[in-house]
Amino acid sequence: HPRCKVALLCDDDVDAEYGWSVRRSLESESYRPCRIPLPAGEACKTWTVLGEVLETLAEEGFTRGDLLMALGGGSTCDLGGLAAALYHRGMEVIYLPTTLLAGVDAAIGGKTAVDLPGGKNLAGVIRQPLAVIFDENCLDTLSEEAKAEGMAEAVKTGVLAGGKLWELVNDPDPFYESIMEHCAVYKAQVVAEDELDKDYRLALNLGHTVGHAIERHSGYAVTHGKAVAIGLATIARAGTALGW
């Protein structure tokens, strides 16, 4: 509804880069944005931060008919999606990914979660967002390191999908917009077949068993994209050794 309130979740760096533009766009259409600040990266995926977000939504008078927007990388989308699923037993959420990693993978498929002391992503639900909107101009603000992290997830999807996507991720001068499109289409098809991650969708966890262990035992000093890259290499070497 054009008069609904919008909770905009993002960290300070993302807010400084993109927040003003998003708020201006919302206000021009008579929406009423209310920014809820988050810690950057994996640090936002805790019970404490989740509780603070839920309490802020209540204090600001948000209802089930209002909207939550998660602006940022995969961690922000994970946290924002779970908060939206829990508040009033479900308010609509839109993801505005700002990283390649979130654009090719994390923002697609409906998985939400926070971390527990026992491991990564142990508490969450699967609930699809109202929409995922990626502004390709965000690519211009990403470091080469951030692009490489996103490509780790894209390579994973390329291994599974094969065909054109595999060609794209092996191009020494990757066309990121096309890679994102192919990743999104493939993952959406997989999720449509197995939304609750019981069978076919499990393949999308390729490299993540090792990757998540690396993240956790490094205290999340090793970021998700780097951990997935290591996980993929580890599984590939193990498979070669086993003759697969």
Describe every region a protein language model picked out.
Residues 71-73, 97, 223-227:
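Active-site nucleophile and cofactor-binding loops and adjacent substrate-binding regions
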Residues 8, 46, 97, 135, ...:
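Residue-level signal for inorganic ion chemistry
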